[in-house]
Amino acid sequence: IDQAVFVGHDWGALVVWYQPLLNSDRVLGLANFSVPFLPRPPIDPVVLMEQANGPEFYIVHFNRQPGVAAAAFADNTRRFLSNIYRTNVWHDTDENQPSGMSIVDMARIDVQRGDLMMSEEELDVFVSAFQHSGFEAPCNWYRNFSRNWELTSGLEHRVEHPALMIYGRYDMVRPVDMSDSVADLEIHT
């Protein structure tokens, strides 16, 4: 296949947004869910996230304390996955939210907001897979943000290919104006 339309969701959207910048001739178009195109910041994004969100923000935590989160997730894989794969969280009140919660706390707390977004049998599949493979590799994606930032220093950070951006009504990521960065953009919520 010489050319394709690339589709991404969440951190996969970050990969897809950069495809036309890195491999323009291979891209017919893009479709992304949840995460908008974010032009390269002037400083290392991990430093920027730490300044904006503090040391317990999950991406900062993965970079500043390698291995800690992965070990905590592995200690109780079922609890961790059950705590993060939730829906209807916005219906719950803030009084049930532990204060100062970090990503590591998601592996340790018993307070579960909202509803599990899958059956217990479906959760078993995820638990089994992560018990087999562990969490180090997924955490490594976030530890590569600084390196990706370095590697993209010489790129023009403007997407010229046709792009579709879809936000979920209850996404944590809110729509942003990408008109200066994405030339041919259609947005749906």
Give residue ranges: language-model regions.
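Flexible "cap/lid" subdomain of the alpha/beta-hydrolase fold that forms the substrate-access gate
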Residues: 1-7, 11-189
